[in-house]
């Protein structure tokens, strides 16, 4: 099933088609065969990819086998599609965007269709992308009418002199450059509406009000990091933000250095979690800096920041990271993180909980 055909259907039909497609694909999840990698024989840089669909309070007790299969189905589809593009020689930024667009098209994840609601019942979307070779980056924040926020972030990176555009200005720029515009209701889902109602009820029960909500509504992001045949590493992130957010709140996802960062001399990182902490501790860039200036391995740098720095600060979440050799790290300090990867040998990994 082509996930992008879903876009042309009315909301109810689109969601029904997605559910059928996801269920059909779920039967192939339990054992994912390795993908042949011919890059070594061809003398090219081996390629690799890692993706995430958000971290947070993902309790096994509330996860049915059918629902888990649906999540893993979309993760598998996305990571294999991105890997196939890399094998064909596509640039890293193309693979990142096309991979994330699959996740943005799924109502399961908090990005694009399926994005959470603001306090006022709308969707405000953020995304960013960064190229580790050129250090070019692009981001959009608080957009409501752009079909694919990650595509808009790529447009900002490639075609504008800026790094970040926000709100109506970002929407106008995307429209002028031919990106698809949609009504904000395209991103509606009943599941997220119920989450908004629960968040509002919780906020009314505590004296601190706004910002006091706990649970899954604090989390939710999608992202991808890749190593392409040119030896470049690229990172991208897209999100609907925090459920019941107000006042134009922007999290870490569109902030270069916090939710997204890439440097060929160290690593590429896409983050997910409690965004305020990721901004304050500059999480994505910190991981890369520990590799570049302290000589830490990718795994040590990522684990130190996620499971030491963030934990001590009180920040929950995780990251996916990749270095110029194709090593992948996917640490998280929450109950779970939707994630998948294909390494330089073509080995596929799809997981939700701790190994």
Regions found by a protein language model. Give the residues of each.
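Short, low-complexity disordered leader/linker segments with a strong preference
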Residues: 5, 32-36
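Bacterial N-terminal signal peptides
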Residues: 18-30
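Alpha/propeptide regions of enzymes that mature by internal proteolysis
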Residues: 36-355
């Amino acid at each position: 099933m082509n996930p992008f055909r879903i876009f042309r259907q009315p909301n109810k039909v689109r969601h029904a088609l997605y559910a059928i497609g996801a269920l059909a694909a779920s039967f192939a999840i339990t054992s994912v065969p390795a993908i042949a990698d011919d890059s070594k024989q061809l003398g090219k840089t081996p390629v690799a990819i890692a993706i995430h669909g958000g971290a947070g309070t993902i309790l096994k007790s509330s996860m049915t086998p059918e629902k888990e299969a649906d999540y893993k189905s979309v993760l598998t589809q996305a990571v294999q599609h991105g890997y196939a593009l890399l094998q064909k020689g596509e640039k890293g930024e193309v693979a990142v965007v096309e991979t994330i667009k699959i996740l943005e098209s799924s109502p399961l994840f908090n990005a694009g269709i399926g994005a959470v609601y603001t306090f006022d019942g709308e969707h405000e979307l953020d995304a960013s992308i960064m190229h580790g070779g050129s250090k070019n980056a692009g981001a959009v924040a608080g957009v409501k009418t752009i079909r694919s926020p990650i595509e808009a972030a790529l447009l900002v990176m490639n075609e504008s002199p800026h790094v970040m555009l926000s709100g109506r200005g970002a929407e106008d720029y995307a429209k002028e450059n031919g990106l698809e515009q949609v009504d904000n209701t395209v991103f509606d889902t009943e599941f997220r509406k119920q989450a908004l109602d629960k968040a509002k009820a919780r906020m009314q029960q505590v004296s601190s009000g706004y910002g006091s909500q706990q649970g899954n509504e604090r989390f939710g992001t999608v992202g991808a990091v890749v190593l392409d045949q040119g030896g470049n590493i690229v990172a991208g992130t897209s999100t609907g933000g925090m459920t019941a957010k107000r006042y134009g709140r922007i999290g870490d996802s569109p902030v270069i250095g916090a939710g997204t960062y890439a440097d060929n001399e160290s690593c590429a990182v896409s983050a997910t979690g409690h965004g305020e902490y990721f901004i304050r501790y500059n999480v994505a860039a910190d991981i890369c800096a520990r590799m570049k200036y302290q000589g830490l391995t990718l795994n040590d740098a990522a684990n130190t920041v996620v499971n030491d720095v963030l934990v001590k600060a009180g920040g929950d979440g995780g990251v996916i990271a990749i270095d110029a050799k194709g090593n992948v790290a996917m640490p998280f300090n929450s109950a779970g993180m939707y994630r998948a990867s294909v390494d330089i040998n073509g080995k596929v990994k799809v997981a939700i909980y701790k190994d």
